[in-house]
């Protein structure tokens, strides 16, 4: 019987085992089938048939059974090992994308081993407090992570029916965000920035100060025990990486942070897997360890440019500005890995940072990102030039999930009305400022002068704050009311009369 079973496995067919009818043997057939099925894969074959190298791609010929997305190990003539992934299969040809770059690859002497498996990353709770390179290898002189599991870096698709709508507001301590663009736990909201603006400082401040405004209680929860940060850097300079690392160390949160660093001098192609490694780690921490994970991805512009480089090397038809036509889909595979899942306490909140080339919000990268994500935080150069920190322009900023994360029982019942009125007054103030530049201050009405006064005080008192100033959402709303008292009650048309009568009087700040 044993010999027949062995012959069955060798001949490529699972052995015929008797179906167990009960007792401890239940599942023996399934187990035997699973074991034999795993070892029925093709043997690992090594090839020395590199027919060409093009940019980050290696083209192999005479390959037996190549599979899409299969991992390939390359051994260079000097013994250096690199890894890649099959991007394209055509008959016996295979196009392999090499993560560490193709410099030094000798077409005649490089051997390529096909593993028959997809790209998996080892994950463990011990990854917190560690620093990895863009390929997931430790670079902090610590030991290799003892994996609790090996997960596919593309992630597991979440059943839309099992997603929970984000309803718990995260208090960031930044008035422009908490008061007017509130972030919910499980949301994906990017920071639209540009070269030279303090987007890193804003992201670090959010990491330092983020806490939960508890539902049904006006109490801020600063409990840190189940909070984790996963930080992925793509194509950033050493200064940015050091800034984040030292900031996490200084505020004592490094033990709850996992860093993936692909620096500017690292291979471009590696940037394509760095965010996926980070998100796979975040999914493990959120859904297996039930932690609330904040994922920061910087800089998504570098990621998109790496995507364009691979696309150009494959000679695909380019889309807008040379970016591939599938960039929207590709970005969605990253951004849509945020959220909450029914039956699990953990959550993933994503804050991708992208630098808009030439400050252009119509550029394909911010344009497509804005379609996928639930709003954006817009960092403005004009505010930055006037020494206002954080230079967040609230007019183009947006949080699509704000409406469900604020209000009575979550923040305060006047939150939505105050936010709407501040938006309206600031927008009118901007119009008046533009008109003043044309007609002069003498031609303005008394109402116009009130809007101008509001504009200046709003930018100086509400938007501007210190990098270590942590305002509660209630302090933010009280500052908002102080500014709205510049106007007589009759001009505050966005706020219901009942809310006005409760909060407009001077002593209402005690609420």
Swiss-Prot record:
Assigned keywords, A-Z? ATP-binding, Cell membrane, Cytoplasm, Cytoplasmic vesicle, Deafness, Disease variant, Hydrogen ion transport, Ion transport, Membrane, Nucleotide-binding, Synapse, Transport
Q: Which GO terms describe its molecular function?
A: ATP binding; proton transmembrane transporter activity; proton-transporting ATPase activity, rotational mechanism
Q: Which GO terms describe its biological process?
A: ATP metabolic process; proton transmembrane transport; regulation of macroautophagy; synaptic vesicle lumen acidification; vacuolar acidification
What domain of life?
Answer: Eukaryota
Task: Report the main location listed first in the record.
Answer: membrane
Q: InterPro entries under this entry?
A: ATP-synt_VA_C, ATPase_a/bsu_AS, ATPase_F1/V1/A1_a/bsu_N, ATPase_F1/V1/A1_a/bsu_nucl-bd, ATPase_V1-cplx_bsu, P-loop_NTPase, V-ATPase_su_B/beta
**Protein family according to the UniProt entry:** Belongs to the ATPase alpha/beta chains family.
Biological role: Non-catalytic subunit of the V1 complex of vacuolar(H+)-ATPase (V-ATPase), a multisubunit enzyme composed of a peripheral complex (V1) that hydrolyzes ATP and a membrane integral complex (V0) that translocates protons. V-ATPase is responsible for acidifying and maintaining the pH of intracellular compartments and in some cell types, is targeted to the plasma membrane, where it is responsible for acidifying the extracellular environment.
Name under which the protein is recorded:
V-type proton ATPase subunit B, brain isoform
Q: Which organism is it from?
A: Homo sapiens
């Amino acid at each position: 019987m044993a010999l027949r079973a062995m012959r069955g496995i060798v001949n490529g067919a699972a052995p015929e085992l008797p179906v167990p009818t009960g007792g401890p043997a239940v599942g023996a057939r399934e187990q035997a089938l699973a074991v034999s099925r795993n070892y029925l894969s093709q043997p690992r074959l090594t090839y020395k048939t590199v027919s060409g190298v093009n940019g980050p791609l290696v083209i192999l010929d005479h390959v037996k059974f190549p599979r899409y997305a299969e991992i390939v190990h390359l051994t260079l003539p000097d013994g250096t090992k690199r890894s890649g992934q099959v991007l394209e299969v055509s008959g016996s040809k295979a196009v392999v994308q090499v993560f560490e770059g193709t410099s030094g690859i000798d077409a005649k002497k490089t051997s390529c081993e096909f593993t028959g498996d997809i790209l998996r990353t080892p994950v463990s709770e011990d990854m917190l407090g560690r620093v990895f390179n863009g390929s997931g290898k430790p670079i902090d002189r610590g030991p290799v992570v003892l994996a609790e599991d090996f997960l596919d870096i593309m992630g597991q698709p979440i059943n839309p029916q099992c997603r929970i709508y984000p309803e718990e507001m995260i208090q960031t301590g930044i008035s422009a965000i908490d008061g007017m663009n509130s972030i919910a736990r499980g949301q994906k909201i990017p920071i639209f920035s540009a070269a030279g603006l303090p987007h890193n400082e804003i992201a670090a401040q959010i990491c330092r100060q983020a806490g939960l405004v508890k539902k049904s209680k006006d109490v801020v929860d600063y409990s840190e025990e189940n909070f984790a940060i996963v930080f992925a850097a793509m194509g950033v300079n050493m200064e940015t990486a050091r800034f984040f690392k030292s900031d996490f160390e200084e505020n004592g949160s490094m033990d709850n942070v996992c860093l993936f660093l692909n620096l500017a001098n690292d291979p471009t192609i590696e940037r394509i897997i760095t965010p996926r490694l980070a998100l796979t780690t975040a999914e493990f921490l959120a859904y297996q360890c039930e932690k609330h994970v904040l994922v920061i991805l910087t800089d998504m512009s570098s990621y998109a440019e790496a995507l364009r480089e691979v696309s150009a090397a494959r000679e695909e038809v380019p889309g807008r500005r040379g970016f591939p036509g599938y960039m929207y889909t590709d970005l969605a595979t990253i951004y849509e890995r945020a959220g909450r899942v029914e039956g699990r306490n953990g959550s993933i909140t994503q804050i991708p940072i992208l630098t808009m080339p030439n400050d252009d919000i119509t550029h394909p990268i911010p344009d497509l990102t804005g379609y996928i994500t639930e709003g954006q935080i817009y960092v403005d150069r004009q505010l930055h030039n006037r020494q206002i920190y954080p230079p967040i322009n609230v007019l183009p900023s947006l949080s699509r999930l704000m409406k469900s994360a604020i209000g009575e029982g979550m923040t305060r019942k006047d939150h939505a009305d105050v936010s709407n009125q501040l938006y309206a007054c600031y927008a009118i103030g901007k119009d008046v400022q533009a008109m003043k530049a044309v007609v002069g201050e003498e031609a303005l009405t008394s109402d116009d002068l009130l809007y101008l006064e509001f504009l200046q005080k709003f930018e100086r008192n509400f938007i501007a704050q210190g990098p270590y100033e942590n305002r509660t959402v209630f302090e933010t709303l009280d500052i908002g009311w102080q500014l709205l008292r510049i106007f007589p009650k009759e001009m505050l048309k966005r706020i219901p009369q009942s809310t006005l009568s409760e909060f407009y009087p001077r002593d209402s700040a005690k609420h």
